[in-house]
Amino acid sequence: MKIIILGAGAVGRTLASLLSEEHDLVVVDQDTAQLHRLEEESDIRTLTGGASYPNILVNAGIMDADMVVAVTDSDETNIVSCMISKVLNKSVQTVARVREISYLKGKTKEAMDSGEIPVDIHISPEQLITEHIQGLIEIPG
């Protein structure tokens, strides 16, 4: 599977390390130091640039990518990157980390769920942790 990971922070690096054996990966980030660190750890192609820039996505191979995983530090960049990725490749599966809970409620959640905002899968670490703790409190033992 051809996967583009947008963001070379802790999550992006961990994903890249886990997936690099079985998949064709490209990691995109604006931080060249992070990318060099990743290159030293494993044999992964990297690209310096903005995650939501169409030319960077094209250079990363979006036209024939199977999946884009957007895990930058910016929710807005992650969402826009997924939107631009879908414009460039309608069949690509998009995954975005979304930390701000307000994006996952009301009209914006409806827009994501309906595909109006083309993010196929949105992952909110904060929401997952909150739900897990709430479950522990409600079902003790």
Task: List PLM regions with ranges.
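Cytosolic regulatory regions of ion transport systems
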Residues: M1-G141
